[in-house]
A protein has these predicted regions:
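Loop-to-helix entry and N-terminal half of a specific, functionally important transmembrane alpha helix
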Residues: 370-408, 414
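Central hydrophobic cores of alpha-helical transmembrane segments in multi-pass inner-membrane proteins
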Residues: 3-4, 34, 56-70, 87-95, ...
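Hydrophobic alpha-helical transmembrane segments
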Residues: 57-62, 115-123, 345-364
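Interfacial loop-to-transmembrane-helix boundary motif in multi-pass membrane proteins
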Residues: 77-85, 108, 112, 126-151, ...
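Short, hydrophobic transmembrane alpha-helix segments
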Residues: 36-52, 68-76, 98-105, 130-135
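Hydrophobic, glycine- and aromatic-enriched re-entrant/interface helices and adjoining loop segments
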Residues: 153, 162-177, 256, 264-355, ...
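A juxtamembrane structural motif centered on a specific transmembrane helix
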Residues: 3, 7-13, 397-463
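Hydrophobic alpha-helical segments of polytopic membrane proteins
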Residues: 218-281, 293-295
Length: 463
């Protein structure tokens, strides 16, 4: 316990660090993920392999190591975030392990994903150790903006970018492949926050009123125009609707939060929809993507993936087929783009809804961290990063259920892919650093205030 905030009536809130609560929830997260791995082995092979204790021990050790660093470096951080992320990451590992058995047990995607998980946690810890004050990131918004756009456009460079399944979102260096847009996701959120905080007064100025809605001034449209052009380039030349929607949506939401003007949000939505209609009219591959969404059964061969995903979700029903008892391998890319369908088939609608609830809680804790932040830059940066995770999940679940066109985005922490997993672990580190600063008592207050009267002390919750 430590002294926290003093209110006007003299009441002192004692902020609990809540690290033991975090450790207890991490044990539950470990049991859920490793339990899925165990049930997969029992349902498929009817016996556990000799390595099961090693797998479980390493799985648990990784969680404990991350907890120890959080306890030492950011002891006041939100105690709920890390267990939720470990639960999602563990479920993803267990499902990828299950899919490795299709059609035979010769694939080792889980081994690769486990290594990426370990590397992600290493970078999570490194971020905690290096970024002691998130406000240092505010110094270079324009440099970060340029770096983010460069990474976003790298797949268009001849000889470096590579096209996979119709989308040009990968780069390859030797035998290593990566999605640089995942780096851009973090860098641009930080750059947007720095730029918008510095230019808030200018961007908040009112322009003309149309239908009762105050629109921004024409001279202030430069930033949103740049992002619109970048988004259209991604959609048209990289054939990646998901990434374009993700970045443009993140920028417009952060712009709205900064200015509190509905006109920016409406202008952003209208311009994105207008660009999408223009791309649909002018480019054949964009029309194919939308036609597959609206009329999937008109071409069974072309739309095989989304059709099988619908069948898989229907076969899973409410309770699911059980770990290792479904047929998720009928859906191409069941371990990456369509891992949500695999979860829905084997764990049912109930399991899929539980995963969605976990993402909702994760986003809510991020937004709570944003609201409690003491500086505008941190508030906006955390809101942008949290919204990015929420929008990504919405696009994925909407795609596999045909609420939206397929976007090609991956489920955070669950889908196979090193770039996405590492970037998301860095996002979690940044959010937890800010939450630590929010809940940590001010040094000058701790140094000068006497011990509180026990009758005035109130135990703090899991802020």
């Amino acid at each position: 316990m430590s002294i926290g905030q003093e209110f006007d009536d003299g009441t002192v809130v004692i902020q609990a660090k809540r690290r033991w609560t975090e450790l207890f929830m991490l044990l539950i997260a470990w049991a859920i993920g490793f339990g899925g791995w165990v049930l997969t082995e029992l349902n498929i092979n009817h016996v556990l392999p000799d390595t099961w204790t090693t797998v479980g021990g390493v799985w648990l050790a990784v969680a404990v190591v991350a907890h120890i660093f959080v306890r030492i470096v950011i002891p006041y951080a939100d105690p709920v975030i890390l267990p939720i992320v470990f639960t999602l990451n563990g479920l993803g590992l267990a499902m990828i392990h299950r899919i490795d058995y299709i059609p035979d047990p010769h694939y080792h995607r889980m081994d690769a994903q486990a290594l990426w998980t370990a590397l992600g946690i290493v970078l999570f810890v490194a971020t905690l150790l290096i970024l002691r004050d998130h406000r240092n990131l505010q110094r270079y918004p324009y440099v970060l903006f340029i770096v983010g756009l460069v990474f976003l456009m790298l797949p268009l460079v001849p000889g470096l970018g590579m096209e996979t399944l119709g989308s040009r979102v990968w780069i390859h260096v030797g035998s290593y492949t990566s999605q640089p847009a995942e780096v851009s996701k973090v860098v641009l959120a930080i750059a947007f926050a720095g730029y918008l905080v510095d230019n808030r007064d200018v961007l908040s100025r009112a322009g003309h009123k149309i239908l009762g809605i105050t629109l921004p001034r024409a001279r202030d449209l430069g930033p949103i125009a740049v992002m619109w052009v970048a988004t259209m380039l991604v959609i048209v030349y990289q054939n990646d609707l998901g990434t374009g929607m993700l970045f443009y949506g993140m920028f417009v939401v952060m712009l709205y939060i900064t200015t509190e003007r509905v006109g920016w949000a409406i202008l952003g939505a209208v311009s994105f929809l207008g660009g999408a209609v223009l791309a649909y009219t002018c480019f054949g591959h964009v029309r194919v993507r939308f036609d597959s969404w609206l009329h999937p059964f008109s071409n069974y061969t072309q739309n095989y993936q989304i059709i099988q995903a619908q069948f898989g979700l229907a076969w899973g029903g409410l309770a699911g087929r059980g770990w290792g008892l479904g047929r998720p391998g009928m859906v191409p890319l069941a371990w990456s783009d369509f891992i949500a369908t695999s979860i829905g088939e084997e764990l049912g609608v109930t399991g899929l809804m539980a995963v969605i609830v976990l993402f909702f809680i994760l986003t809510a804790r991020g937004m709570r961290t944003s609201l409690g932040c003491r500086d505008d830059f941190g508030k906006l940066m955390v809101a942008g990063l949290s919204f990015t995770l929420a929008l990504q999940v919405f696009a994925i679940i909407g795609g596999v259920t045909r609420l939206l066109p397929l976007t090609g985005l991956t489920t955070p922490f669950m889908s196979q892919g090193g770039s996405s997993l590492i970037a998301n672990w860095v996002i979690v580190a940044i959010i937890m650093i800010v939450s630590h600063r929010n809940r940590k008592p001010a040094d000058d207050f701790v140094a000068t205030v006497p011990a509180p009267d026990p009758q005035q002390a109130v135990t703090g919750g899991t802020r």
